Amino acid sequence: MIKLDIKDAKKFLKTNVFSLQDQVNELHDVIQNKSGLGNDFLGWLDLPLTYDKEELDRIYKLKEQHKNVDAIVVIGIGGSYLGAKAGYEFLKTPFKKQKPELIFAGHHLSANYLKHLLKYLNKKNYVINVISKSGTTTEPAVAFRLLKAHIENKYGVKEARKRIFATTDKARGSLYQLAINEGYERFVIEDNVGGRFSVLSAVGLLPFVFVGIDVEKMIKGAQDAYHDAQDPSLKKNKAYLYAVTRFLLNQSGKDVEYLINYEPRLAFFAEWWKQLFGESEGKGGKGLLVHSASFTTDLHSLGQQIQDGNRIIFETVLNVKKTDKLSIPFVEEDLDKLNYIAGKEISYVNEQAFLGTKEAHIDGGVPNIVITIDKMDAYHFGYLVYFFEIACAMSAYLLEVNPFDQPGVEAYKKNMFRLLGKK
């Protein structure tokens, strides 16, 4: 469960949030009946209930077969990478050596990164999970070509085939064909599930299982979020209330939304969130510009601009109620003048920083939406994923755009291919 507080956003709105209830009711029916724009990509809608249990069992068995590996290299970009990365960072213990280690590749074209990754893997016992619906997306295809050669040279072609798992289309595409030809273990990206909505499919579940994340709890969180989203009432449906509030803030002249966190482990969740909303809404000259910031760190860089810059910003704060306990010690000399908070929990100081910042930003004309979760665990990760997915669908439909395509992404690819001389 989560808490949603919009009281520090409502005062900036020109329209009462509840005045959109009839429109929300209509759009809720459009979503549930799968009759709106992009309706052939609504497979994620029921995924918490209809996920492939047999496929998940195969993932568990695969993990058991490779229980002694040092690392799993996940190759993917965009939705084929960000969800797994977000969950891994959300749930891992800082500085704890993870076995197997989760390594990502194919999410950029850095020769420096790939060269040193290959060198690093020379001494690692590893497996590969390549994720791509088509198999021809440039960044992961380049990385896979290099890593496929590396793992075959390291273990031999026959053994390498047992160590490469393909998450791809169920019936077509170059990666599908390669997986068939080579005999790789295959997992499915369904046609009706777009990449940024695929976290709760094999795209995210396979990496999560391999690093020991409790995916059953994650799915339970998503199921609860699903059930909480069945009633369209804005007095009950927090995801829709969030969608309406951000829509009306946009209508009131706020063009930029920052997702704010006070826990570093949430930084990559924000990266997933930015893709979710940026690709879903940013089309036809519409959509909020989505940014993220990690406080208090970014208060010493972006804080000035947020506090005193162009008044086109609002903040959605992702707040965590329970964190680790660690007290500030008393020091006799008190040269740093911190004894006034000696004995206090650092989490308490962090909370006061949050409250003080919120007050300052509101006074400075920056609306605040606050989403509070009890703690950072698999359940709450799953809940938040579905919460934001369904909120995103509602938000995009309020804008009258298709939430599930991304035509603008092709522009850079066409230019790059032309410059590279692709025929």
UniProtKB/Swiss-Prot annotation:
Q: Record's Pfam families?
A: PGI (PF00342)
* Record-listed E.C. numbers: 5.3.1.9
Q: Does the keyword Isomerase apply?
A: yes
The EC class name is isomerase
The residues responsible for catalysis, as annotated, are 279 (proton donor), 300, 413
What biological-process GO terms show up in the record?
A: gluconeogenesis; glucose 6-phosphate metabolic process; glycolytic process
Protein's pathway: Carbohydrate biosynthesis; gluconeogenesis; Carbohydrate degradation; glycolysis; D-glyceraldehyde 3-phosphate and glycerone phosphate from D-glucose: step 2/4
Single GO MF descriptor: monosaccharide binding
Looking at the record's lineage, which domain of life comes first? Answer: Bacteria
Q: What does this protein do?
A: Catalyzes the reversible isomerization of glucose-6-phosphate to fructose-6-phosphate.
Which family does the record assign?
Belongs to the GPI family.
Which PANTHER family does the UniProt entry name for this protein?
GLUCOSE-6-PHOSPHATE ISOMERASE
User: What name appears for this protein in its UniProt entry?
Assistant: Glucose-6-phosphate isomerase
